[in-house]
Design a protein with these regions (language model features):
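Short, charged, amphipathic alpha-helical segments
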Residues: 304-308, 327-334
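Beta-strand/loop-alpha-helix module characteristic of Rossmann-like adenine-cofactor folds
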Residues: 2-10, 113, 120-268
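Short, charge-rich amphipathic alpha-helical segments embedded
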Residues: 304, 337-353
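Class I S-adenosyl-L-methionine
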Residues: 1-112
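Amphipathic, heptad-repeat alpha-helical segments
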Residues: 269-308
Length: 353
């Protein structure tokens, strides 16, 4: 059975004229063009440019329309041979999981699909900031709903920094509500979250880069500490924040030149962050020692060996932690706690942790 119709996903890049020649060809030859806006504010210059270049109507659609997808797929399947439908979006179309799911549905219906790739904020962030692309790790979106307490963002950033990797934070913008997360709001949210977890992931002195409206004529780049950036105004969205991990000297030189700041102010943030075990093991060791001290006077001499082994495990935990052997440190604390608990299970003494 032959395929029925075509669904072409066209990336528009980062702004006006960011679409490739191939993308323009697909837009011009389409029967229907849907232009998707839901994470980036409407940009009149882009709309004007596309209307001029393709000479046909653009149908602006939102997130719900694309997620539902039925109208798009129905349009592609109309007529004996189907129609050519283009879904255009800023950035690269396959960065959005919604598009990938729609593509799979189209293929199952016998609709031919094609993807025209383009630049994204994720790729442009490295080029714009002067950081090495391969050193970026998991990218995170900061949403309006969670900006007050950024637990998931905090933990992902923590893991990235432990690896010495850079982190890209994409700040959400809801085109329907006309609201988004500003860089100062995201920074304030991270600092509030640090107060809860206290792992040294971020502080007022954390060095970061703010990238606003990349790919546009009014693009803005800023660098500084959280304390400095939290006081700045960054204008219209979209915005993103880069928090560097370990910096190669060539990255430091590039950041200094691009952002126009003294090289001595450019710094990575990985050295300041505490490993999870560095936070937990000292607390567990101290607590276990307090409990041991409280029950020791109640124990008969025959349990001296148990007490001695508890102390040995606690010292092992501290030594393993100092040598970066976090898993063994956690296990050693667990063994120490288990020995003390065994005294309770045996009915020797009652212990209140």
């Amino acid at each position: 059975m032959g395929r029925l119709g075509k669904l072409i996903f066209v990336g528009l890049g980062l702004g006006p004229k960011g679409v490739s020649m191939e993308g323009l060809d697909e837009l011009r030859s389409a029967d229907v063009v849907y232009l998707e806006y839901y994470t980036t504010p409407h940009e009149p210059a882009l709309l004007k440019y596309l209307q001029k270049e393709i000479g046909s109507e653009l149908i602006i659609v939102d997130r719900a329309f694309v997620e539902d997808g039925r109208i798009i797929l129905t349009e592609a399947g109309k007529g004996e041979k189907g129609r050519k439908v283009v879904l255009a979006s800023l950035g690269d179309p396959m960065v959005a999981t919604t598009h990938d799911e729609l593509r799979a549905r189209a293929i199952r219906l016998g609709i031919e699909t094609k993807v025209v790739h383009a630049a994204t904020v994720a790729t442009a962030a490295a080029g714009s900031s002067g950081l090495h692309y391969y050193k970026f790790s998991t990218t995170i979106t900061v949403t309006r709903e969670e900006v007050e307490r950024l637990g998931q963002v905090y933990h992902t950033l923590h893991q990235n920094l432990l690896k010495g990797a850079h982190t890209l934070l994409l700040l959400e913008y809801d085109t329907e509500a006309g609201e988004g997360v500003s860089p100062p709001e995201a920074i304030a949210g991270l600092l509030r979250t640090e107060e809860n977890f206290k792992r040294g992931v971020v502080t007022d002195s954390t060095f970061a880069l703010v990238l606003s409206r990349l790919g546009r004529e009014d693009a803005q780049l800023a660098a500084g500490t959280f304390e400095e950036l939290e006081k700045k105004a960054f204008g219209e969205p979209p915005h993103s924040i880069v928090i560097p991990g370990n910096l190669h000297f060539t990255e430091s030189d590039s950041v200094s030149a691009i952002f126009g700041i003294n090289a001595t102010r450019v710094k990575g943030n990985s050295d300041e962050v505490l490993r999870t075990a560095q936070t937990l093991v000292p607390k567990y060791v101290a607590k276990t020692r307090r409990v041991l001290a409280s029950v020791r006077p109640k124990l008969r001499k025959e349990y001296d060996t148990v007490v001695e082994n508890v102390e040995l495990y606690l010292r092992d935990a501290e030594n393993f932690l100092a040598n970066g052997q976090d898993e063994l440190a956690m296990l050693s604390v667990g063994y120490a706690e288990g020995l003390i608990d065994s005294l309770t299970f045996a009915g020797v003494v009652k212990i209140d942790w």
